[in-house]
């Protein structure tokens, strides 16, 4: 099939961009390296839009949470990623989490069935010299293409590190020591009856021993060329967090507040005391057979992981479907090398989208892919792109990536209200809701005036 646009990379951003283009009548060639005999060291399958790190799209609260607002805005623009996420949704309290396999399969099925999309399993080693192109190769860009990008952008480095959390088989968890509950008993329509997290409590003595085990455990060594590569805080390995101080984890992923331990009750606390520390597991698939260890991204060696994690109450006989790991991410200094439409300065036929632009997170990656698809469709139609207002989550994210961030200190960024034009006149308690109310109103006006789709 001849094509109007070539998309390189079939992750979240590339898949979303392909969908947005195809539903506007644009012919798309979607090149994905996996399935051609090539594989990254972090992916497990050759499925489109595979989720490598967590299975969570984070908060789905569109009234007081920035990523929840981004969910809302993407749904308003018929996002394939959000549509597939709803098909694959699993219970996760007030968050949105998905069954990885169901999600990837839904995205792939939808794209392969679309007459305007041709999915081609091939590795692309260099940036095309001509033709409208969207590069959405993500954090695991092949070395040859990364070198081509470095040459085209004049950058010295494109990389930082992410860590992956372990996944445990549900039937290997000893529920006589754990209980199911969401923090503060928060629920959503997708929630399980009792709650959405398995909680493994720790006493002070157990926590201190576990903390020391994280410090002492044997860790993956970096190769020489990797040693100066920084971490992104959003996927900070738990042992790195532990090294920051003995209390750091107790105020982070292992905090016990809002969780009532039914095995530690008293007259004063009939529902149970809050544990000194806790390890939480979140459902990872629709069947409920796999649960991931929340916040437990790690670069401990496999043997050290098994030994240490089996000291956690309830996980003494844990069987791991996947152990934690470390992978290298790739991103551009986008404020320096991209224009306001995500085009590479000096080679404007090429757009970048997704995590390679320096946005961080599944939803953010897909959102940038969505906008790249819309921009490219507008360009093909000979129309002028008027981007979403900066007061929206989409507009705030795009503005940050394409020029509002400081180029000298640019780092991967999740969507957050700090990227929005401030509302200083609104009291702090009402400010988050004011941001989302303003965004929804402005998005509605933008869609009415700018978004014309013949799907």
UniProtKB/Swiss-Prot annotation:
Chain residues that bind FAD: 9-14
Transmembrane segments: none
Alphabetized PROSITE patterns for the sequence: GIDA_2
Keywords, ordered alphabetically: Cytoplasm, FAD, Flavoprotein, Methyltransferase, NAD, NADP, Transferase, tRNA processing
Primary location recorded for the protein, binned into one broad class: cytoplasm
Reactions mediated catalytically: uridine(54) in tRNA + (6R)-5,10-methylene-5,6,7,8-tetrahydrofolate + NADH + H(+) = 5-methyluridine(54) in tRNA + (6S)-5,6,7,8-tetrahydrofolate + NAD(+); uridine(54) in tRNA + (6R)-5,10-methylene-5,6,7,8-tetrahydrofolate + NADPH + H(+) = 5-methyluridine(54) in tRNA + (6S)-5,6,7,8-tetrahydrofolate + NADP(+)
Source domain of life: Bacteria
Xref: InterPro entries: FAD/NAD-bd_sf, MnmG-rel, MnmG-rel_CS, MnmG_N, TrmFO
Subcellular compartments: Cytoplasm
GO molecular function: flavin adenine dinucleotide binding; tRNA (uracil(54)-C5)-methyltransferase activity, 5,10-methylenetetrahydrofolate-dependent
Gene Ontology BP, a term: tRNA wobble uridine modification
One Pfam short name: GIDA
GO terms under cellular component: cytosol
EC number: 2.1.1.74
The protein's required cofactors: FAD
Cross-referenced Gene3D superfamilies: FAD/NAD(P)-binding domain
UniProt keyword Translocase, yes or no: no
Family in the record: Belongs to the MnmG family. TrmFO subfamily.
NCBIfam families linked: gid_trmFO, PRK05335.1
Function: Catalyzes the folate-dependent formation of 5-methyl-uridine at position 54 (M-5-U54) in all tRNAs.
Protein name (record): Methylenetetrahydrofolate--tRNA-(uracil-5-)-methyltransferase TrmFO
Species whose genome carries this gene: Erythrobacter litoralis (strain HTCC2594)
């Amino acid at each position: 099939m001849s094509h109007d646009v070539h998309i390189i990379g079939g992750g979240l951003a590339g898949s979303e961009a392909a969908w947005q283009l195809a539903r506007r009548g644009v012919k798309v060639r979607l090149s994905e390296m996996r399935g051609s005999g090539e594989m990254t060291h972090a992916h497990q399958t050759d499925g489109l839009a595979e989720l490598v790190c967590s299975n969570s799209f984070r908060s789905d609260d569109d009234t007081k949470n920035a990523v929840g607002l981004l969910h809302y805005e993407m749904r308003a623009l018929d996002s394939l990623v959000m549509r597939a996420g709803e098909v694959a949704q699993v219970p996760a309290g007030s968050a949105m989490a998905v069954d990885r396999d169901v999600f990837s399969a839904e995205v792939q099925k939808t794209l392969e069935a679309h007459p305007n999309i041709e999915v081609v399993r091939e590795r692309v080693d260099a940036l095309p010299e001509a033709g409208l192109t969207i590069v959405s190769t993500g954090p695991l860009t092949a070395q040859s293409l990364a070198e081509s990008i470095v040459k085209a952008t004049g950058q010295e480095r494109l990389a930082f590190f992410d860590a992956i959390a372990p996944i445990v088989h549900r039937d290997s968890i000893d529920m006589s020591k754990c209980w199911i509950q969401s923090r503060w008993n928060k629920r959503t329509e997708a929630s399980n009856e009792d709650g959405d997290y398995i909680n493994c409590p720790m006493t002070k003595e157990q926590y201190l021993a576990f903390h020391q085990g994280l410090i002492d455990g044997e860790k993956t060594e970096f190769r020489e060329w990797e040693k100066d590569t920084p971490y992104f805080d959003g996927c900070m390995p738990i042992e790195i967090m532990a090294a920051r101080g003995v209390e750091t984890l107790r105020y982070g992923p292992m905090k016990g507040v809002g969780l009532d331990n039914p095995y530690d009750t008293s007259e004063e606390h009939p529902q149970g005391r809050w544990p000194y520390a806790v390890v939480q597991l979140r459902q990872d698939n629709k069947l409920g057979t796999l649960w991931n260890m929340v916040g437990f991204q790690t670069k401990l060696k496999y043997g050290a992981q098994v030994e240490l994690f089996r000291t956690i109450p309830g996980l003494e006989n844990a069987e791991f479907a996947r152990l934690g790991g470390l992978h290298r991410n790739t991103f551009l200094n986008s404020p320096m090398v991209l224009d306001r439409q995500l085009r590479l300065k000096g080679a404007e036929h090429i757009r970048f989208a997704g995590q390679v632009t320096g946005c961080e997170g599944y939803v953010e990656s897909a959102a940038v892919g969505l906008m790249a698809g819309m921009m490219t469709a507008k360009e093909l139609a000979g129309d002028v792109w008027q981007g979403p207002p900066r007061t929206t989550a989409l507009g705030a994210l795009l503005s940050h990536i394409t020029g509002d961030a400081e180029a000298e200190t640019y780092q991967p960024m999740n969507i957050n209200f700090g990227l929005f034009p401030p509302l200083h006149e609104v009291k702090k308690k009402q400010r988050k809701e004011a941001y989302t109310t303003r965004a929804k109103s402005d998005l509605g006006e933008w869609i009415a005036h700018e978004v014309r789709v013949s799907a």
